[in-house]
Swiss-Prot record:
Binds 2 divalent metal cations per subunit. Involved in de novo para-aminobenzoate (PABA) biosynthesis. Acts as a self-sacrificing or 'suicide' enzyme that utilizes its own active site tyrosine residue(s) as the substrate for PABA synthesis. The side chain of the tyrosine residue is released from the protein backbone via cleavage of the C(alpha)-C(beta) bond, leaving a glycine in place of the original tyrosine residue. Reaction requires O(2) and a reduced dimetal cofactor. Gene3D superfamilies: Heme oxygenase-like. Its cofactor is Fe(2+); Mn(2+). This is 4-aminobenzoate synthase. The record marks 23 as: Side-chain cleavage. NCBIfam families: fol_rel_CADD. Belongs to the CADD family. It comes from Chlamydia pneumoniae (Chlamydophila pneumoniae). GO terms for molecular function: metal ion binding; oxidoreductase activity. Keywords: Iron, Metal-binding, Oxidoreductase. Fe(2+) 2 binds at residues 77, 138, 173, 176. Coiled coil: none annotated.
Length: 224
């Protein structure tokens, strides 16, 4: 019998971000620089909000060990020098986006919906739902970062400083996702795995819709 965690991993793999046309074009050097600039500006909303997702989970967690692990992830995001938000700004600037453009960017509805989805799931009474949302995202990031770095180096001439955000997350999110998986397996003994699976699917869909906003095709995922 297939376990709920195996179902979760299969669900994520079936709609992995690397299967999206936007990232496929990125890997093949078929994106226009303006598309990358638009992406860097719009995704900034999610980058800035990510520590808030973790804070919401940390504030409501009664399990001391799990709370410490969430705090470690939060510290990775907030306390580095440079921190992860600054690394993203560095990436945007390397693409020719100005500080003023980044600060004054009007975020798309797709970006706002994505952040709202993560915030709502991380505020759910069931802690496992929020952890499942972050796991769904972070388990994909190391592979995505490998392709992003390769594309940025080969096709766009971005320096190591420019893509440092992805270098950091290529390593860090292996650890974060592994810890989140362990936390999920601890919590789901007390909580409903169906709610975790549903929350994960909502994350997959909102990520897919966000990426679709940067290309002409807005068709739903047909990779299942």
């Amino acid at each position: 019998m297939t376990s709920w965690i195996e179902l979760l991993d299969k669900q994520i793999e079936d709609q992995h971000m690397l299967k999206h046309e936007f990232y496929q074009r990125w890997s093949e050097g078929k994106l226009e620089k303006q598309q990358l600039q638009a992406y860097a500006k719009d995704y900034y909303l999610h980058i800035k909000a990510f520590p808030c997702y973790l804070s919401a989970l940390h504030a409501r967690c009664d399990d001391l060990q799990i709370r410490r692990q969430i705090l470690e992830n939060l510290m990775d995001e907030e306390a580095g020098n440079p921190n992860h938000i600054d690394l993203w700004r560095q990436f945007a600037l390397s693409l020719g986006v100005s500080e003023e453009e980044l600060a004054n960017h009007e975020f798309s509805q797709a970006a706002q919906d994505m952040v709202a989805t993560f915030r709502r799931l991380c505020d759910m009474p069931q802690l496992a739902v929020g952890l499942g949302a972050l796991y769904t995202y972070e388990i994909q990031i190391p592979q995505v970062c490998v392709e992003k770095i390769r594309g940025l180096k080969e096709y766009f001439g971005v320096s190591a400083r420019g893509y440092a955000y992805f270098t950091v997350h290529q390593e860090a999110d292996i650890k974060h996702a592994s810890e989140e998986k362990e936390m999920l397996q601890t919590l789901v003994g007390r909580e409903n795995p169906d709610a975790v699976l549903q929350g994960s699917q909502e994350v997959l869909d909102t990520l897919w819709n966000f990426l679709s906003s940067f290309i002409n095709s807005t068709e739903p995922c047909s990779c299942k």
